[in-house]
């Protein structure tokens, strides 16, 4: 591969995402610390800073799997693939930010068709290597052939169509992050998993998933949407449903771990295991969201003729998170794992990083935002619950105004129910309280 980075090293500039140095192209602006929405593409292998929170959560989840052994047996390796890696920021963060004690168990592969992006990955990774040196022996693929690619400081780099890369080995961890819809890659992703594995899927075609583009939603996801306060949750559940039914076609079942609507994209993270019985039971977790009078909703497996116009789906109607795992995704854990200490920061500055104390504060704020509200909402999002958009509550309760969120949460909790904020760009309440209890709590707090 040609060393594209060396030829333009004076034109580009350094950035830090998490603990990891990223050499940006000269034609890409220095990112803002709180990006929202998709970045403007500046050429092959562009860095999308708005995806940084998703990459941070990926580091946290993979580190958690290694630390708590919920994916493979204690001491066993995890083979992880970023199937559409672009410039490889995610895999480089895996190597830089997952604790050194676990690095020897982590076998990382990165794949992309874009040669320029891979050049950028390998040269940057070689120039700014991780602290822990990893030199795994190469393993044959599932067809006992020698793999096609090169090893760079613990990252095996391949240049293939993602569907080929996914099918050539059995991975315990697969990240699928396309530019647009993941539909074209899902079958290969599921087939490329080992018997028990973890799959993370990103979709940036939110107009299709929410129903804002009904024709695209029907073509890609076979679903019908309603654009209202629940469109974000619908988008998450439509994508989760597609992953679940795709897995079922290959005699596999899913267990949701985390699922979020994060600005311009939807991302779902699931455990996948081979089970014919589990696959046969997938329809018990599929259904429709039917809007009710008064602004709330309920899930049904099959809407009747009177409900169809008020229904969106089909979608996943089961729990969306794993409580035990999600409640460990705290802000303190994120800073400990993904923010550099002063020694590392000085070493980064020594090689050219322009980074001020204000940059550090902004970066910490961004890292905290990546997981904000997740631990608090973990219990409710892992079982049956109801969502309420805070802006809808005044009309529902007839109060003309909404109470402060924390005050409403406290009121609901005093009655023995759970209440938390959902990590969404909009202010959502998640609770297990009955609808009439929620409205009574709104009225009580609005009288104070």
List the model feature ranges, each with a label.
Residues 1-448:
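SAM-dependent transferase fold signal centered on methyltransferase-like domains
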């Amino acid at each position: 591969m040609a060393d594209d980075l060396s030829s333009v090293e004076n034109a580009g500039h350094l950035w830090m995402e998490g603990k990891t140095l990223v050499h940006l192209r000269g034609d890409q602006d220095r990112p803002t610390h709180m990006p929202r929405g998709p970045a403007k593409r500046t050429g092959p292998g562009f860095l999308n800073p708005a995806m940084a929170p998703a990459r941070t959560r990926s580091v946290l989840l993979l580190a958690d799997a290694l630390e708590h052994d919920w994916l493979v047996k204690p001491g066993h390796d995890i083979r992880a693939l970023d199937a559409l890696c672009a410039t490889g920021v995610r895999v480089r963060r895996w190597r830089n930010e997952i604790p050194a004690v676990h690095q020897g168990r982590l076998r990382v592969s990165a794949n992309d068709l874009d040669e320029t992006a891979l050049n950028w990955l390998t040269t940057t990774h070689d120039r700014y290597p991780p602290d822990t040196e990893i030199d795994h022996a190469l393993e044959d693929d599932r067809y006992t052939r020698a793999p096609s690619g090169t090893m760079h400081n613990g990252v095996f780099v391949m240049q293939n169509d993602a569907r080929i890369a996914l099918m050539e080995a059995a991975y315990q961890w697969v990240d699928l992050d396309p530019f647009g819809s993941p539909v074209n890659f899902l079958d290969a992703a599921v087939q490329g998993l080992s018997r028990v594995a973890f799959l993370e899927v990103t979709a940036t075609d939110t107009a299709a998933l929410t129903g804002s583009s009904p024709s695209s939603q029907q073509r890609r996801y076979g679903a019908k949407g309603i654009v209202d306060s629940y469109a974000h949750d619908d988008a998450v559940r439509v994508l989760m449903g597609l992953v679940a039914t795709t897995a079922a076609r290959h005699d596999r079942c899913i267990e949701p771990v985390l699922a979020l609507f994060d600005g311009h994209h939807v991302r779902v993270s699931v455990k996948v295991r081979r089970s014919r019985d589990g696959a046969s039971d997938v329809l018990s977790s599929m259904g429709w969201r039917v809007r009710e009078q008064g602004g709330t909703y309920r899930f049904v497996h099959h809407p009747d003729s009177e409900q169809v116009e008020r229904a969106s789906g089909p979608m996943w109607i089961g729990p969306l998170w794993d409580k035990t795992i999600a409640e460990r995704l705290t802000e303190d854990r994120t800073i400990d794992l993904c923010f550099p200490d002063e020694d590392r920061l000085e070493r980064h500055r020594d090689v050219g990083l322009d980074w001020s104390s204000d940059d550090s504060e902004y970066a910490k704020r961004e890292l905290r935002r990546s997981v904000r509200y997740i631990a608090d909402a973990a219990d409710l999002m892992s079982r049956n619950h109801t969502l309420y958009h805070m802006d809808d509550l005044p009309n529902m309760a007839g109060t003309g105004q909404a109470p402060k969120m924390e005050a409403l949460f406290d009121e609901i909790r005093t009655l023995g129910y759970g209440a938390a904020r959902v990590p969404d760009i909009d202010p959502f309440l998640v609770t297990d309280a009955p609808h009439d209890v929620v409205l009574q709590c709104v009225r009580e707090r609005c009288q104070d």
